[in-house]
Amino acid sequence: MLLTYVRKYRHLINIGCIPTKTLIHDGIEGSSFKEAITRKKEVVQALNNKNYQGLNSKDNIDVLNYKANFISNEVIELQDNNGTIQETITADKIVINTGSRANIPDIKGIDTAQNIYDSTGLLNIDYQPQELVIIGGGYIALEFASMFANFGTHVTILERGDAIMTNEDQDIANLIVKDLQDKGVTINTNTSTIAFSNNKDQTIIHTNHGEISADTVLLATGRKPNTNHLGLENTDVKIGKQGEVIVNKHLQSTVKHIYAAGDVKGGLQFTYISLDDYRIIKSHLFGDGSRTTENRGAIPYTVFIDPPLSRVGLIASEAKLQGYDILENKVFVSNIPRHKINNDSRGLFKAVINKDTKEILGASLYGKESEELINLIKLAIDQHIPYTVLRDNIYTHPTMTESFNDLFLEPLWSLIISGSYAGESFSCVPLYTLISDH
């Protein structure tokens, strides 16, 4: 089989997870903004080169750097940056994986005001903002707010709703708000942006509560599927209300030989969903088709604020609404010995259990290293492992993972022994603190 890969969008490496998480990491580590931007460019370039060579070095793959435009269900026209047609290719199997783009709101003055960026543009600025105003209070907004606050920028979030993180556990959401405010982040809720204007080198944000000035504005107002300018109107592929390619459980579009993977098909916008989409398409094309969107299990996610929030499954309020009889437990990060070594006591871990089956319904982990821990809980949920297995498992010490010994205890026992780890006062913790500091 000859595979032709038309390289146009590379969201993950160029403008998504890799550059943002590199900057977030370097901000936490105390790097200057200039140093972090330089390293971000190096990381992006290195991974781009690696991925390109990984594809281009294979005899049965051609990598073409063109804009792709459908002219029928089977025929794709390839154009260069000037719009000149370079060639036309025909295929009996096609995968659309063009990702997503920023959703730009219709706000007066948005086209003429200066220094207004979407997340892509903000990753490529060559100066550190002194005053950053973020329009929107979703996960992208929170990651950028936390990141720039760590670099010393004063950040203001403008959220039109009455709260942020309303879909998360509210105990944890309240802690996140407090920790962001402790960094100097201002969060203005019930605030609608009406217009933008310029005043010398400042951008003026006009809201229903007055005016705010800043040298930089981020539009964190969501993303939408990248289906524009693909020529899909020349095909029988159906598009949804948000511009997404409509697919079935095998990720086939309404034209059965055209598949869609990643953000372009709508739904959860995570890199690892796109990677699993590949497994589903591979299973349908070359296997028995048994892997589908209906059986890939619980989907974890992490919001890479500082410290990160990671979650999988249900929170308590959702579980109750679905009729479950639940057990709920929590452990504060300040009661986990590893927090002393990490020098970070911020955070709270919570778990929700099905009281009848003893299976884990969900977990929300707000604290350092949660982005790693959540994957173990995802595995337990998928494999229907009772919570007692995680409760009684032997974990290395001192680690954040050993918090599961307490997190999955019955609530009464958790209150009695939380934080009472043998060896905490005289051996492991002081030794590993010295190792960590050197």
Task: Locate each region found by the language model.
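A Rossmann-like FAD-binding core segment of flavoenzymes
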Residues: 62-65, 69-82, 89, 152-249, ...
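FAD-site-proximal beta/loop scaffold in flavoenzymes
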Residues: 112-128, 211-288
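Rossmann-like dinucleotide-binding cores of NAD(P)H-dependent redox enzymes
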Residues: 42-52, 123-124, 129-133, 139-202, ...
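FAD-binding beta-loop-beta segment adjacent to the flavin cofactor pocket
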Residues: 102, 236, 243-257, 310, ...
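Glycine-rich Rossmann-fold phosphate-binding loop(s) that bind the pyrophosphate
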Residues: 5-6, 135-138, 263
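Flexible, glycine-rich terminal cap/loop adjacent to redox cofactors
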Residues: 1, 5-8, 13-18, 22-23, ...
